[in-house]
Amino acid sequence: MKTINIWRFATILFLSLTAIPVCGETVEEMPRFPGGDQALMEFIENNLHCPQKMLRIGANGRVIVSFVVEKDGSITEPKVVKTTLKYKSGKPYEDTRIIKQCEEEALRIVKMMPRWIPGKQCGVPVRVKYHVPFKFNQTKPKSRWEK
């Protein structure tokens, strides 16, 4: 009888332990740019420069950059995930020099970013992969004083 109770206790304990989610599978608290999403958008807007040729012809597009927000909030491993540039008509823009300039500009901005507030799992700071889209859609050069 005593042996059966021990086995029951062990089985219940085992089942309850395996039902606990493992830390690291999902992030309870995503990393945040200091000041929040609005501050991130302003940071990008104030620092992003479109290639002049792209502005002249009215092309627009998007570059998606991924990076890792480390436990201390620093940014590492920035890389371009996807680039889409188009003419106003919707036709794909295929000038590889301009595409490369847009990608380099997006990476430059990521490398300029201040430390983020790190993501947390189970109350502990963790490394988190993050994606940010950079929109290149200005139709005219923007003055630094224009808002």
Which residues does each predicted region cover?
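Charge-biased low-complexity segments
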Residues: 2-11, 15, 19-147
